């Protein structure tokens, strides 16, 4: 399942993203974050983290540096407060 999700992200990055332009307010971009989250945390938790990240990426968000939490970390300790404290 990880392989399929990463392949879909790669397709998005190559085929769809260039048409939309750079819109992500975070570093790394949401697609890179999703790929990394799935690689480190597996398909289920990685997808959950990626969806949370995409929900935070909107025009009213300040953005900033938002890295994938390390494996076995408590993701509730992270979130928007962490993203706000690491603005680019």
From Swiss-Prot:
Predominantly, its location class is membrane
Keyword set for this entry? Cell inner membrane, Cell membrane, Membrane
Offer a single GO CC term for the protein: plasma membrane
Q: Which InterPro entries match?
A: Membr_insert_effic_factor_YidD
Q: Where in the cell is it found?
A: Cell inner membrane
Bilayer disposition of the protein? Peripheral membrane protein
Which residues are listed as membrane-spanning? none
> Which domain of life does the protein's organism represent?
Bacteria
Family, similarity comment: Belongs to the UPF0161 family.
Q: What is this protein for, i.e. what is its function?
A: Could be involved in insertion of integral membrane proteins into the membrane.
Q: What is this protein called?
A: Putative membrane protein insertion efficiency factor
The species this protein was found in = Burkholderia vietnamiensis (strain G4 / LMG 22486) (Burkholderia cepacia (strain R1808))
């Amino acid at each position: 399942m990880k392989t399929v999700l990463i392949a879909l992200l790669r397709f998005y990055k190559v085929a769809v993203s260039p048409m939309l332009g750079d819109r992500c307010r975070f570093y790394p971009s949401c697609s890179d974050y999703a790929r990394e989250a799935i690689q480190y945390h597996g398909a289920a938790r990685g997808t959950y983290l990626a969806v949370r990240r995409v929900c935070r990426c909107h025009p009213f968000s300040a953005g900033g540096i938002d890295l994938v939490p390390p494996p076995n970390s408590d993701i509730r300790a992270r979130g928007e407060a962490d993203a706000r404290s690491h603005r680019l």
